[in-house]
Amino acid sequence: DPRFQYLHLPVTTGDIVPHCFEDVPNSYLDMVDGQLMHILDTLWSAGRNAIYFCNAGKDRTGVVSALLLQRMGASRQEIVDNYVLSADNLKTMLADFVAKRPELKLEVVTPRAWTMEQFLDRVPDKLRSISQNA
């Protein structure tokens, strides 16, 4: 369909599932690199509606969504609230995912406000580091 342009822009880092929920914000920070900035710039400059997603729709998609919302001027609370919506939306899928992978804990993979708050606290330093190395 010529009305659509498909771009495959994978997040190339941060693919290790943390063992405890306290490590989740750091796993999100690991995703923030030049490739993620390219993804954000591509979505930002699309000039029309865009769909983006990952396998589960909460980690990589959550990080991209948070940074896009931040770029759009959304409040910190709006970003956190948006992220936490995934907990209810993905409840069944996450329970099935954990049931198939006994090494994982539901408390680690469930989106929490604390996770996004910690990520938002730490991401400015990471973004500065990326821009200085560009």
Region roles according to the model:
Residues 1-51, 63-134:
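Cys-dependent protein tyrosine phosphatase-like superfamily
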Residues 56, 60-61:
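Ser/Thr-glycine-rich phosphate-binding loops at phosphate-binding pockets of nucleotides
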